[in-house]
A protein has these predicted regions:
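A membrane-periplasm/extracellular boundary helix in multi-pass inner-membrane enzymes
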Residues: 171-176, 232, 254-296, 313-318, ...
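Alpha-helical transmembrane segments of multi-pass inner-membrane proteins
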Residues: 110-114, 134-138, 152-181, 191-256, ...
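Long extracytoplasmic/lumenal interhelical loops at the membrane interface
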Residues: 294-360
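Helix-loop-helix junctions and helix-breaking kinks within/between transmembrane helices
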Residues: 18-30, 70-74, 122-128, 191-197, ...
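N-terminal signal-anchor transmembrane segment
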Residues: 2-88, 114, 118, 393-395
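Transmembrane alpha-helices of multi-pass inner-membrane enzymes
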Residues: 35-41, 205, 381-384, 388-397, ...
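Aromatic-anchored transmembrane helix interface
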Residues: 73-85, 100-113, 121-144
Length: 453
């Protein structure tokens, strides 16, 4: 970890500049972020471009009650992704051959243009549609390009960087618990505890996939620190949905690795067991003295989610077939914010499927799910645990709308996972290198010797 920090001092310095300017000269951030992208490119620091995008998205996720002046990153992040996308579009040959992820979702992005005709906020809808497509286009190709340049050292550094983001939560806690906690729940650098939990859940899957594909990438002590950190922060978040999603992945990824049929049968059995337990859940939680941790008083109404789902379903009837354009769900929830708060609900729809339905209708939702399922089913031929990732993700999407948003610190992590499990040159890296595994040891992986465009 310390070696990583020393080796990426330029990224850390730039991040400190972002924070300083964000506090004292907010408007300058709009120019500073894209200039930083070109600075990284000029110095051939391609992983730093991707790491920078991730931390900008984390900063933009900070709520106003955490650091008021950090709100500038909510708007400025658009300029960062535009700079990253601009480099990709102008130098596409550098990234050849391109990642397959975007092509799998291309039918959805082509269709998503049509619902814009029914949008009540056309400018915002167009912006969100473009940013969504750009993320699916840019992130997988940057991940693949960085791997081609640095080999497994890139993923090693990526995991360390994502771990450092979580550990920085301790710094905020040391400054003042009001910065790191909300209503008694830990949130670290993120806007809310559920957001940090989603990040941890996705991080568990990414770190597990990378560690499985290259067993020599991390030493035992490093794995202990990485996974120990993730699990600690996941538990501290108190998020029931993300805990269950992580459990689904951790329990069944070995089943799917042995046999897809065995994994599917085990998953069905798990669902039936959950149904049996849920009918006696209140008694079980009380018996073990975990009523406060699981927020038993909010269990019956799903922390307000059931009300939000019912409210969203009523509005879906107006946009049932074709939807109202991407960001339609945000427009509706914002319009009725005062009413929703009077009913005890805060936030969005808290269900990706319903949010997507509001945005692109049942037609768009079907196309999107077809692409998502197709990607992981095909990937399972390369990485068998892909099916466990798919089912765990599908469960998580039932309780949060994170995949509907593009410029958040969650979608980008899923795109990284998609890239790792779908690209043969990553998943089959040993065959690409004449079947001889790299002996990375404790000091990390050696770069894969591959041609760089």
């Amino acid at each position: 970890m310390l070696t990583f920090l020393r080796g990426h001092w330029q990224l850390i310095f730039v991040m400190l500049v972002w924070l300083s300017v964000g506090f004292f000269l907010q408007q300058a951030v709009f120019a500073l972020l894209p200039l930083s992208v070109f600075f990284f490119k000029q110095r051939d620091l391609w992983p730093e471009i991707l790491f920078g995008l991730l931390i900008v998205l984390v900063l933009s996720d900070m709520e106003k009650d955490l650091f008021l002046k950090m709100i500038v990153f909510k708007s400025a992040k658009n300029f960062y992704i535009l700079a990253v996308a601009g480099i990709f579009l102008l130098e596409t040959n550098r990234f050849m051959p391109l990642s397959r992820v975007f092509n799998i979702f291309l039918p959805f992005f082509l269709y998503s243009i049509f619902p814009l005709l029914f949008s009540n906020s056309i400018i915002v809808a167009v912006e969100k549609t473009i940013s969504y497509a750009l993320m699916f286009m840019v992130v997988p190709n940057y991940v693949l390009y960085c791997y081609r340049r640095q080999g497994w050292s890139f993923f090693r550094n990526l995991v360390f960087f994502m771990t450092a983001i979580l550990l920085f939560g301790f710094v905020l806690q040391a400054m003042d618990p009001v910065y790191s906690h909300v209503m008694g729940r830990f949130r670290g650098m993120f806007g809310n505890p559920n957001g940090m939990a989603i990040y941890c859940f996705l991080f568990i899957m990414l770190a597990s996939v990378v560690n499985t594909l290259n067993r020599n990438l991390f030493s035992f002590r490093e794995r202990l620190v990485i996974f120990g950190t993730i699990f600690y922060f996941l538990l501290m978040s108190g998020s029931r949905a993300s805990l269950t999603s992580a459990a689904i992945f951790l329990i069944f990824h070995r089943f799917f690795a042995s046999s897809p049929m065995l994994g599917f049968v085990g998953l069905v059995g798990f669902v039936l067991a959950v149904e049996l337990v849920s009918s006696n859940l209140e008694m079980i939680i009380t018996y073990f003295g975990l009523a406060e941790y699981f927020r038993l008083n909010t269990l019956e109404n799903g922390s307000g989610r059931y009300f939000a789902w019912d409210f969203a379903w009523q509005h879906i009837q107006r946009f049932f077939v074709f939807g109202g354009g991407i960001a339609n769900d945000e427009t509706i929830m914002r319009k009725y914010r005062l009413y929703l708060e009077s009913q005890g609900h805060q936030g969005g729809v808290h269900n990706t499927y319903l949010s997507m339905w509001l945005n692109v209708g049942i037609v768009g939702l079907t196309i999107f799910l077809r692409s998502l399922l197709l990607l992981f089913i095909k990937a399972s031929k390369l990485v068998p645990m892909s099916l466990a990732i798919m089912f765990a993700t599908l469960f998580s999407l039932m309780y949060e709308s994170w995949l509907v948003g593009s410029l958040n610190p969650y979608t980008i992590v899923l795109l990284m996972i998609m890239t790792v499990v779908t690209e043969p040159e990553i998943a089959n890296w040993q065959e690409e290198n004449d079947g001889e595994p790299q002996d990375d040891g404790e000091d990390g992986a050696q770069p894969v010797q591959m041609a760089v465009a």
